[in-house]
Amino acid sequence: MKEYIEFLKDKMAISCQTGFEVNPDELTPSLYPHVKDTVRWAVSGGCRAIFSSFGMQKTVTQLEILRVVLKHKGGKGLIVCPKRVVVEFLTQAEQHLHMKVTYVRTMADVMICPTDIMVTNYERVRDGEDGVRIEPSYFTATSLDEASVLRGFGTKTYQEFLPLFADVPYRFVATATPSPNR
């Protein structure tokens, strides 16, 4: 049993808190209490994973997290999601948070984007267009939606995303299906 405990300890990665405290009054008033709690918890950690069941407002939670971080720290935010979910982010942002979010395809789009929060799909970051990908290091805060795509340790997406996002100060992932990577 002792060997197994040591094995588990070797696999643990302890994350330091790199975030900041958020006053509840700073949050969008119409959010559900569980969303407000999740946003405050995530921002206080600075780099957190959100495992929330379908229908628990992960989309709005991620948007609010990025809004709060950018309000305090400046810069731009990027949400990376499957292509089929992009429209959901655009509509939920306006419907629930009264904010405009822009879909970006290239770094050129990013550089001229008028909104603070942008959304793109995984392939735009992983593969890019004509070999030029969107650079996560440009952003102050990022969130990876449907992060279950990262669960396969040997996949191209997993292997490429870890180093790409290493320099982003505020990193978040959200999924309804937590699963170990290694």
What does each of the following model-derived ranges do?
Residues 1-169:
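SF2 helicase/translocase NTPase motor core
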